[in-house]
C-alpha cells in the first residue's frame, strides 16, 4: 500500500492574529462603515415590509 499526501498538512494550532495599531482615521472609517451597513439593512427591511420609502404624500400631475 502506498500513502498519498494531498498537499500541505494543516498545523494543529492556528497562528495568533497580530494586533493592528489603528489610528483615529481607521477607527472613524470602520464606525462609518458600520453605520452605513446598519442604515442599508434598515432600508432593506423597510422595502420588504411594503412601507413607502419617503412620505411624498399625494402625487400631482403637471396638468390642470
From Swiss-Prot:
Ranges of compositional bias, category Gly residues: 53-64
Annotated Basic and acidic residues bias: 27-38
Coiled-coil segments: none
Location(s), subcellular: Cytoplasm; Nucleus
The keyword Cytoplasm is annotated on this UniProt entry: yes
UniProt keyword list: Cytoplasm, Nucleus, Protein biosynthesis
Record-level GO BP terms: cytoplasmic translation
GO cellular component term, pick one: nucleus
TM segment ranges: none
InterPro entries associated with the record: TMA7
Region Disordered: start-end pairs: 1-38, 45-64
Subunit note: Interacts with the 40S ribosomal subunit.
Family: Belongs to the TMA7 family.
Job description of the protein: Involved in protein synthesis.
Miscellaneous information on this protein: Present with 3100 molecules/cell in log phase SD medium.
Protein name: Translation machinery-associated protein 7
Source species of the chain: Saccharomyces cerevisiae (strain ATCC 204508 / S288c)
Amino acid at each position: 500500500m502506498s500513502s498519498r499526501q494531498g498537499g500541505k498538512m494543516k498545523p494543529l494550532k492556528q497562528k495568533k492574529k497580530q494586533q493592528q495599531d489603528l489610528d483615529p482615521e481607521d477607527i472613524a472609517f470602520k464606525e462609518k462603515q458600520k453605520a452605513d451597513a446598519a442604515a442599508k439593512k434598515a432600508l432593506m427591511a423597510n422595502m420588504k415590509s411594503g412601507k413607502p420609502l419617503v412620505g411624498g404624500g399625494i402625487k400631482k400631475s403637471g396638468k390642470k
